[in-house]
From Swiss-Prot:
The record marks H427 as: Increases nucleophilicity of active site Cys. The keyword Iron-sulfur does not apply. This is Hydrogenobyrinate a,c-diamide synthase. Pathway: Cofactor biosynthesis; adenosylcobalamin biosynthesis; cob(II)yrinate a,c-diamide from precorrin-2 (aerobic route): step 9/10. Its EC number is 6.3.5.9. Belongs to the CobB/CbiA family. Disulfide bonds: none annotated. Comprises of two domains. The C-terminal domain contains the binding site for glutamine and catalyzes the hydrolysis of this substrate to glutamate and ammonia. The N-terminal domain is anticipated to bind ATP and hydrogenobyrinate and catalyzes the ultimate synthesis of the diamide product. The ammonia produced via the glutaminase domain is probably translocated to the adjacent domain via a molecular tunnel, where it reacts with an activated intermediate. Keywords: ATP-binding, Cobalamin biosynthesis, Glutamine amidotransferase, Ligase, Magnesium, Nucleotide-binding. Transmembrane segments: none annotated. It comes from Brucella ovis (strain ATCC 25840 / 63/290 / NCTC 10512). PROSITE patterns: GATASE_COBBQ. InterPro entries: CbiA/CobB_synth, Class_I_gatase-like, CobQ/CobB/MinD/ParA_Nub-bd_dom, GATase_3, P-loop_NTPase.
Amino acid sequence: MKGFMIAAPASGSGKTTVTLGLLRALKRRGEVLAPVKAGPDYIDPAYHRAASGVDCFNLDPWAMRPELISALSSRMTESGARVLVAEGMMGLFDGAIDGKGSSADLARLLDLPVVLVVDCARQSHSIAALVWGFSQFRKDVLIEGVILNRVGSPRHEAMLRGALAPLGVPVLGALPRDPALSLPERHLGLVQADEHAGLESFLEQAADVMEAHIDMDALQTIWLRPKRYDAMANVARLKPLGNRIAVARDDAFAFAYMHLFEGWRRRGAEISFFSPLADEAPKADADAIYLPGGYPELHAQRLAGAPRFRTAIGDAAARGVTAYGECGGYMVLGKTLEDAAGVHHPMLGLLPLETSFARRKLHLGYRLLEPLGGLPWDMPLKAHEFHYASIVREEKADRLFRVRDASGENLGEAGLRVGSVSGSFMHVIDFSGEAA
């Protein structure tokens, strides 16, 4: 399978809009796509799916073993995809410590040519120094095209193209400034795709702009260059939480990694979905319940007023069914959740903690986890933490993980486990050892 990566010198350059527009434009042309998001972001993949009609996989070169990344790319090939379209994260060379885990690392690992999206709103000839520097910084990462974004006028475009001409890096197109091509945001990033009322119109408009201003034939030439993927379809995956896993999925629980579900299914697990916001219960025969992250703080009143959901989870826990929550799911397993207005809402009360979104503090970064029991994972794990909520009260209980940051600094113990119920603010991505 061929492919390419859309990357940028920095966040906010417009790579998400460009990626979405290209995905929709390529879909309209009949291409069978494999959308990919570099890094741990949960929100962009839902937009990728809306644009392409295909589930988007996160590929994280810091948190995932290279074997897993290769296996997932092979899985996309097996599904019939012909073009892998990856969106980078942050700036091309930005990652964890010393840039490790960057979009550039993913491009190198999968041998993807890079198309650099450059915000040109406040520059002209200086763009040549920027593009030259990026193209020379790592010889194992090939920048094979540039898309000029937020171009002010035909004269501005001519100046930019003239500055870049001596470098030999093809300019694939120039996109005019257009506020209508901006996506709405909130505290954890973009507003979720399912909540964007005009998303379909936005995607069609973005595709029209890409078709009108980008040389799609030149882009195709880039992704058709010779390459070869490793085939490691049988790489070890994280053990599933159970044999029949019920997963919460709606606007309050939207942050789940597709590669985990794919891996669990490959290991024989059955996965079903239910909506707590619709007051649905997990399947009665589920032997594990997974409450992923999301935005429970925006829906706390509805969750507090969902008796069927609340009773079913409580009864399942009493029977010894595994119930595991990450981030927002962890908050819902607790006793109370204070929303941004200071209103306290009763949660499931299965873990002895109280959380608050009114008392906000940013917690962000990659994490190295040592499990302390209560889950089927007995090997070191790699994870990501990103939330503003704070724990305001916590009673004594067994801890779930011993935690270090990406540099190895000890962050203490985190998470709670009581009986078959456990959770933490960490989003588990992969294991870091050799044992499965």
